[in-house]
Amino acid sequence: MSGSTESKKQPRRRFIGRKSGNSNNDKLTTVAENGNEIIHKQKSRIALGRSVNHVPEDILNDKELNEAIKLLPSNYNFEIHKTVWNIRKYNAKRIALQMPEGLLIYSLIISDILEQFCGVETLVMGDVSYGACCIDDFTARALDCDFIVHYAHSCLVPIDVTKIKVLYVFVTINIQEDHIIKTLQKNFPKGSRIATFGTIQFNPAVHSVRDKLLNDEEHMLYIIPPQIKPLSRGEVLGCTSERLDKEQYDAMVFIGDGRFHLESAMIHNPEIPAFKYDPYNRKFTREGYDQKQLVEVRAEAIEVARKGKVFGLILGALGRQGNLNTVKNLEKNLIAAGKTVVKIILSEVFPQKLAMFDQIDVFVQVACPRLSIDWGYAFNKPLLTPYEASVLLKKDVMFSEKYYPMDYYEAKGYGRGETPKHAIE
């Protein structure tokens, strides 16, 4: 790339440049306004390929490597070629492999492949991994690993923040898109506007289905993958989903198994009908969530917490679940409100564990908001989320049956140590 900036609009320059007519190609002559010439060495040209991150052909065409990859399920993309290339590129020596429990069955095969084709030592991290917030680069570094591969979750924690090199492997899954398309066409009138999303494994399928249905003249459907940044378009997390305009959508459709991630969107958008397509059993179901009960239970927890004097402020230590900035902000606001604060670090939050802190009146956990939403009733003391604690302190708006924010890891969310747009101060 040339060092010239002539094509950009700039203020009048002090020097007027021209190439020297009789010099070699690595010189550049500039003439000052007083007539003196200044000779500069020209910046060397660097040929930058269009695909800087393209996996080399010798890795893609390695017959032995490709044979080893066949030991893994063909519809699961573990991105072995990309992993091998990154390990070699960074000259890594000790690799940590972190994946959810459902994929641990494949961990030893992947471990053997990487050891054989990269000449490295691998370490399988067997602790629970609920989501991308659980990436445990701290433990990996403590175990002398210089590289961690995190499977099946998106890049929630940026790679420039982690303490060692990280490669996120989404483990995208190939599914029968034609069946999804026929199912949606059978259940929704032509021209329906459907917010469609899923976990990161099915994100390619969401976008592929969108394109195919948009181009189907006989029964076109507007499939709209919503986005709450910094998540990918069409991606949803159990704690983070986009707030949708009920006037703009006829329905929401979640592609994936289970309800955990879908519930985030239903809690955030209770007035939009929700459906789920399970790609494993190929069932399409109408889903519901008892928003009234949610509001009653969480409002009661806040009311009980108002009487509390001693607050236990929990920093989640499961991977990177906790956020120290959010803890500091809550501590400051609680102290300003006349509360006594006891800070606690926990990797996992259980009712039996918190019951041991008998002198604490209220707990506020900076770990996962779904702990409070789903299991708060099981604790003998109120267990508030950062958002609910902010409502208690009159720093955020109160929720209702029509609105409960699920934007924890949004760019300005509490999960990132920021102040969300719905906050009062």
Curated annotation (Swiss-Prot):
Pfam families referenced in this protein's UniProt entry, alphabetically: Diphthamide_syn (PF01866)
Annotated spans, Disordered: 1-29
Disrupted gene: phenotype observed: Increases translational -1 frameshifting. Abolishes the formation of the 2-(3-amino-3-carboxypropyl)histidine synthase complex. Resistance to sordarin and zymocin.
Pathway where it operates: Protein modification; peptidyl-diphthamide biosynthesis
Phosphoserine PTM sites in chain numbering: 44
Keyword Metal-binding: yes
UniProt miscellaneous comment: Present with 2526 molecules/cell in log phase SD medium.
Descriptive protein name: 2-(3-amino-3-carboxypropyl)histidine synthase subunit 1
Organism for this UniProt entry: Saccharomyces cerevisiae (strain ATCC 204508 / S288c) (Baker's yeast)
Gene that encodes it: DPH1
